[in-house]
Amino acid sequence: MGTMTTLTIHRGTHEIGGSCVEIRTDKAKILIDLGMPLDYDKHTTEEQTQIRSDAAEWCKGVDALFLSHAHADHYGFLGLLPQDTPIYATEETFAMLALDGILGDDPTEHLKKHPLTSGQSCEVADIIVTAYTVDHSAYGSCAYLVECEGKRLSYSGDIRLHGVKGVLYKNLPKGVDYLLLEGTTVLRAKNNPTEREVENRFVKAFGEASDAMHLVWCSAKNIDRICALFRACKRCGKTLVIDPYTANVLAAVAGLNPKIPTTTTAEQMKVYFPPRLTTRLTERNKDQYIYSLNPKQNKVSYDDFAHSPEKYVMLVRPTVLTYLQRIKAARIRLIKSIWGGYWDEPNTERFRSWVEVHCEQVKDIHSSGHADTKSLQRIVEHIRPQMIIPIHTDSPSSFGKIFSESHIFYTSTTIGQLSCNSAHARARRDSTPTVRFDDIHSQPITELIHSFTSS
């Protein structure tokens, strides 16, 4: 008798973020990602307890976890994994997660870490998993190919084609049976700007107010964006000033890629030291994250900002507001280089209020970390899967507007059910969110991709 392989999507079929996928055979059980929902903090304490309890249940009996990248909506519940569980990810992802230990705890500290390079395979009993580097706003992101029971399943993770390494999608294996494809921005017709175009927009913005001090709100883990910002600063004769957390993130990544600028290798990159952050590091006996940055040589002070504010571009986030309140500059402008939804979060209210009073202009210069509609089509054109399974999306039905319905496996909107809406199995409905590989029927693809016209 052959083995039975099941696929369970615990979360992500009708939700952006919080992804967790389980693949189980008679001999092994693996998880891909173990994310915290993006809206976790908005839930009641009772709801949060249930969410964590569910995730802990998924972790029982797991033989290994494969992590796609270092964003909390994919790794936020790693702490629930049993002690010494093997975890696989790229070296860059592990480096990013280790930096979580600056302000908190490394979520992989209790796990057995196994770094993977692109194209490298590993075996967990009868399951073979291969990592493939892809482009995303989190440095070191990867997709996975899972092979078992004669079937091949590709998990896209979070992916885009307009980034610095966008062309890497062409390395993804072709002709897989199933493609779990992210759809964060499905049906968004607009093309995303490249990081080079973002850089040029920074340059233009700095030139429009060359005598102003510029603040840029950007994620410390978006390495490609910080590099684009740094290049723009160099082109405009300005100095990029970053906080200790960002400086340590860059230093860690530069250990794997010497092309990444750091405060010790780049003359036009300096550090500011928010008292709240430095005090917290000192209290946690983590002064090394301060002194390794050579403050005597690399520090930019309040006096420096006051004397020549136009010389500086400062990387900020809402948590450094106390520091910003002490800066004296005649003209200040803010550039948001981050997902727009963060601006309206309740915890940014005080920051927004300060910006409204002290910044003469607020500009958006950003590019998504996710594939747009045309990019999703290009990915599918390259891979040519037998069946597409939407994930990391709040609009799975939208996949039917750009791909052939007969090749999309939908889950139902009811938690705990999984329905197959393929042309061969529309009537099927299981009582659990689990399905056998052989129950996802497929056929050779013809005219898989629909033409897409924006409304």
Predicted regions and their residues:
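Hard-cation-handling environments
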Residues: 193-323, 327-328
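Charged, glycine-enriched surface loops/patches
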Residues: 403-421, 435-437, 449
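ATP-dependent carboxylate-amine ligase
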Residues: 328-331, 448-450
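Intrinsic-disorder-associated, low-complexity terminal segments enriched in Asp/Asn/His/Tyr and depleted
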Residues: 158, 430, 439-441, 450
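Cap/insert and terminal regions of metallo-dependent hydrolase folds
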Residues: 163-245, 329-404
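His/Asp/Glu-rich metal-coordinating catalytic cores
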Residues: 2-66, 72-224, 228-235, 239-241, ...
